[in-house]
Every structure is written in C-alpha cells, then in structure tokens.
Curated annotation (Swiss-Prot):
Residues 605-625 are annotated as: Disordered. The keyword Lipid metabolism does not apply. This is Chaperone protein DnaK. GO terms for molecular function: ATP binding; ATP-dependent protein folding chaperone; unfolded protein binding.
Length: 638
C-alpha cells in the first residue's frame, strides 16, 4: 500500500497533509501557502485554473469562476437552499436531467463532483510534488451532517480526480484526531465546534485509553449543511449594496462584475474586523451612469458586522444543545472545546461559544489545518503506520423505510456507531400482493415525505398470501464511510434483492467513468502544456545568454560565427512562438551547437585573464538575481 494523504475538501479553502516520521505535515502548495482557495475558473482559451490563480481573475471572469460548489454537492435543484444560492452567485446553477443542482460554464453543464475533482487534483498534485512519487489513495473529509447522497458525491469526486478514496471521515472527528493524538493519557470528553465556509457541525467526542489504544468515540453529532462563512459574506454584501443604493440611488445587484468585487471586499472586511474594531471598504469605479463613474466608500465597525450576523451565530447554538442531549452528557462534563473552521476566528463566535459551554475554547488547534491533519492520521491508521488509534464514528441522521400510511419506520437511529448492520421484518399491506417497494429514507421526521429520499427498489415474485403473512426482512448495513447498503429478503422463498444506495440523484456509473476519462485527457494536456512551457523557458534563457555572450565577445567573434549564431537565434525565437515542443528542443540544440565554440573561446580567455573576467561575472550574477515575469495585456471590454 502506498502513501495515503489526508484531504480537507472545504467550501472556501482546501488543505492536504501526510503523516511523516510520526508527525503530521501540512503540505505547502505551489504558491507557497498551506491552504488553497476552493475556487475553479474556466478561462476563454479552455485553461482550467484552480486555487489562488482562479481567485485572482474572478473579478474579470465572474460567470465562469466557481466557488462554494460544495454547497451544491449531492443536492436537488429544487431544494430551497439551492434556490436561495442561485440569487447570490454570479455563475449559473442549472437543473440536471436527474433533477440535481449542476452548474453551467460556457454552455456546458457540469456536476458538482466534477468541479470538486479539480480541487482534489490540485491537492493530489501538491502532495505528489512534495513526496516526489505518485499518490493514488486518500482520506477525504466531509461535514458530519452530510447525508448519504452528499457522501457518495464526494467519493465520486475523488474517483474523477484519480484517487482511491480509502475512507470518508467526518470533519469534527478528524479535528479531534489531530487534537487528541499527542494529549496525555486518560479519558476526556471534547466538543468540536466546526463553523467553516459553507457548513456547520458540532460533535461530542470521547477520547479514552483502552488497552493502550487511543480510542476516539463520537457520542453524538449535529449541524447545518447550509450555514457558514459564505452566509456571513452575503450579509455584508447586502449591507454594502443597500448603503450604496441609499447614497447613489443605483442598485449593484444586476452587475456581476460589481458583485464579484463586493464579494472579495466583504470577505476581506470580515477578516479585518476579527482583529480591528473598524475598517473601510473603498471600491473606486464600482459602476457608472450618465453623470459619470461611481465609487463605493463604506466604513463598517465590528459591532455593525456583529449586528448583521448575530442570528447566524445564534443558529449554531441549538445544534450544540441537541448534540449534548443526544450524547447524554452534562455541559459541565466537557473537558475541552475545540474550534475548527476559519469563521470561528470571529470574536462574536468565540464569545457565544464560551458563554454556552462555560469555558474558553482551546487556542492550540489551527482551525484551517486541523481537519486535514486528522485525515492524514486516519490515512496512516488505514495504511498500518499508526497502530494505537481506534476511531468510532456515528451515522448523523436516522435511516429507515416508508411503511403503510406514509410513515417513516426507523431501522438505524441517528448517532449509531458505524459500521453497523440492522435488520427488521416487514410484511405486505394487501392480500396476494406479489411485490413490495422498499423506499429508503434519511431524516428525523415521522412523515416519510418530509425526509430525504435516498432511493427505491422492488422485491418481486412474492408468493400469493393474505396481507400480513409474508415475512420480508429488510437489512440496513452502513460501512465505515457512512455509506448505506440495503437488502430485502423474502424469508419464505429466500429470494433477495440488494443495492448500494446511490440515491435517486447522483451520477451514474457511466457518467463517472466518462468524467474519469475526461480528467485523464485533461491531465495529459496539462502535462504537455507544462513540458511546452518548460521548453519555451529553456529556449528563452538560451536566447538571452547567447545574445549577452555575443555582445560581451565583441570583435572576438568572426563574421561567419556571428551569422551562424544569428540565424540559429532567429530560428529558436520563431520556434518559441509556436506550440511544438520537439521543434523548440531541436532549435535549442542547434543554437547550443553553433554557439559552443564562442563559449569555449570566452572561457579560455577568462582562464588566462581572471581579473578581467571578474567584473562581467559580478554583473552577470546581479542579472541572474532578476526573476523573469510574463505580463499579459488586460483589455477593457466596453
């Protein structure tokens, strides 16, 4: 088994880590940062940008820059939360043929797992660059309150990215792993309060020493998969829009460029107000009318921000209360409170959490990195590198089937430790009924229609019998990823039917395979592009150094040599403008060949007269410190 990386696939930012020599290493990306924005952009020339490069161009390309796509994963287009998001994002959310929420970019419909796969590919590449070897296996985290469809969709994203997802692990559980691995032995109970970019989770976790093993047992979990930092940003954006309208009489709502600038400004202001009591948002030329350009200048205080979002923070308290009740734990028995997710840096969040739990949250856990670190530890456990850790997670929501009268009958209650298997015997509702439909549901409501439908299947060819006589045994089996397998068996005939719940939404196997193939094609294109860029850079460097050498050599170069080198230079410069790597490499070879005699002459002369060579060498060293940069003209589209 190879190295198993841990990936925190976040709504706003993502992070990757690995266990090395007993320590967890959070891996820096190519830009030198430990977290990567979960943003994907599709450029006009077909290039796919991920992370910081996508974020940088968002203002000029709002319709094709996708962010917070995790909020759509495993969701139906008609869900109220999706409809609310449609009003708030500049990109297009559309209805897929199966009713799922997809996005549309440049006229092409794309599934959220397909887009999330681009972020996972970036995380995979980050790990591969650091380790110097191919990575094919990962543990990926999801919000604890993700339902079965959302977990399946996350696993699909991993497959599309070329990863074998060894385990889906809940984010708060991962954070507890990161926190508890190096703590003193002994039993203690912790609360993990995880308020991220798009989701909120709270888990009650007991960390115990059992026969020399660290045992992490999740006692209860609760949350809201549509509450996070993005919602805080939206409140600020709305405030800025209202203030601007009061002053100018103009609404910015219909202007995607202005809204994208506002989004970035809101995020920046929110972060600044965690450490300052006041900040100013200054966006010149935000829009224009007949009287000329308009500028947005708004001062906002921390107290104003808190008044805008206080109800959002309050919404996190009820799930905390429910989780404690479900765990059967008194609030006074909590030893530590761990804050996870960037939004927990907000002073108001910390204040309310401290007030509710009656104790200060720990400050020694990095809220942006703890989840990825825990995922890496779980990866090491699965790989056999860590042997003294046992993780007992739970199913976050009740699972059951629809029975007569539209009632949901539970088979596996919420907060049941997984993996688990439960069976129950049901019967027919009518005389001589020859088939039953097993309708699998997830949720806490008694009325079947009020819960999330995970899928349906039929058990047919039941022998004729009066109602209530046939015995149909339904078995629910949840694996360690929290993914459900359901079976139904006629006990009289032994006939059985079983499925892995793929949900009545989600991607088909054919769709996933096609996306995997597309990703492989893109990967090959990316590799070719990198190789071409490398060849161009090598060619550019050789052109520069050769021209400098000719200038330094002066009259020591014969006319014949100069002509040959000039011809090779022109040929290489022309090749660099083209797209053929082999041609560039051939022209590099040619130029190297014709310029080699001149280089040898210069070297021999320097060897004879080292003092004369010292000055140019110093100048060359200075010049070599200069980093080349490429600039692209930004055209105003008016």
């Amino acid at each position: 088994m190879g190295r198993i990386i841990g990936i925190d696939l976040g709504t706003t930012n993502s992070c990757v880590s690995i266990l090395e020599n007993g320590n967890v290493k959070v891996i820096d990306n190519a830009e030198g940062t430990r977290t990567t924005p979960s943003i994907i952009a599709y450029a006009n020339d077909g290039e796919i940008l991920v992370g910081q490069s996508a974020k940088r161009q968002a203002v000029t390309n709002p319709h094709n820059t996708l962010y917070a796509v995790k909020r759509l994963i495993g969701r139906k287009f008609d869900e109220q939360v999706v409809q609310k998001d449609i009003q708030m994002v500049p990109y297009k959310i559309v209805k897929a043929d199966n009713g799922d929420a997809w996005v549309e970019v440049n006229g092409q419909k794309m599934a959220p797992p397909q887009i999330s796969a681009e972020i996972l590919k970036k995380m995979k590449k980050t790990a591969e660059d650091y380790l110097g070897e191919a990575v094919t296996e990962a543990v990926i985290t999801v919000p604890a309150y993700f339902n079965d469809s959302q977990r399946q969709a996350t696993k699909d994203a991993g497959r599309i990215a070329g990863l074998d997802v060894k385990r889906i692990i809940n984010e708060p559980t991962a954070a507890a792993l990161a926190y508890g691995m190096d703590k003193a032995k002994g039993d203690h109970t912790v609360i993990v309060y995880d308020l991220g970019g798009g989701t909120f989770d709270v888990s009650v976790i007991e960390i115990a020493e059992v026969d020399g093993e660290h045992q992490f047992e999740v006692l209860a979990t609760n949350g809201d998969t549509f509450l996070g930092g993005e919602d805080f940003d939206i409140r600020l954006i709305d405030y800025f829009v209202d203030e601007f309208k009061k002053e100018s009489g103009m609404s910015l709502k219909g202007d995607p460029l202005a809204m994208q600038r506002l989004k970035e400004a809101a995020e920046k202001a929110k972060i600044e107000l965690s450490s300052s009591t006041q900040t100013e948002v200054n966006l010149p030329y935000i829009t224009a009318d007949a009287t000329g350009p308009k500028h947005l200048v708004v001062k906002i205080s921390r107290s104003k921000l808190e008044s805008l979002v206080e109800d959002l923070v309050q919404r996190t308290i009820e799930p905390c209360r429910i989780a404690l009740k479900d765990a059967g734990i008194d609030i006074g028995k909590i030893n530590d409170v761990i804050l996870v997710g960037g939004q927990t840096r907000m002073p108001l969040v910390q204040k309310l959490v401290t007030e509710f739990f009656g104790k200060e949250a720990r400050k020694d856990v990095n809220p942006d990195e703890a989840v990825a670190m825990g995922a890496a530890i779980q990866g090491a456990v699965l790989a056999g590198d860590v042997k003294d850790v046992l993780l007992l997670d739970v199913s976050p929501l009740t699972l059951g089937i629809e029975t007569m009268g539209g009632v949901m009958t539970a088979l596996i209650e919420k907060n049941t430790t997984i993996p688990t298997k439960k069976s129950q015997v049901f019967s027919t509702a009518d005389d001589n009924q020859n088939a039953v439909t097993i309708h699998v549901l997830q949720g806490e409501r008694k009325q079947a229609g009020q819960n999330k439908s995970l899928g349906k299947f039929d058990l047919a060819e039941i022998p004729p019998a009066p109602r209530g006589v046939p015995q149909i045994e339904v078995t629910f089996d949840i694996d360690a990823n929290g993914i459900l397998h359901v079976g139904a068996k006629d006990k009289a005939t032994g006939k059985q039917q079983s499925i892995v719940i793929k949900a009545n939404s989600g991607l088909s196997e054919e769709e996933i395979q096609q996306m995997v193939r597309d990703a492989e094609v893109n990967s090959e294109e990316d590799r070719k592009f990198e190789e071409l860029a490398s060849a161009r850079n090598q060619g550019d460097a050789l052109v520069h150094s050769t021209r400098k050498m000719i200038a330094d050599a002066g009259d020591k170069v014969t006319a014949e040599e100069k002509t040959a080198v000039e011809a090779a230079l022109v040929a290489l410069e022309a090749a660099i403008k083209g797209d053929d790597k082999a041609v560039i490499e051939a022209k590099v070879e040619e130029l190297s060949k014709v310029s080699a005699p001149i280089a040898q002459k210069m070297y021999a002369e320097q060897a004879e007269n080292p003092e004369a060579a010292a000055k140019p060498a110093e100048e060359t060293a200075k010049a070599d410190d200069v980093v080349d940069a490429e600039f692209e003209e930004v055209k105003d589209h008016k």
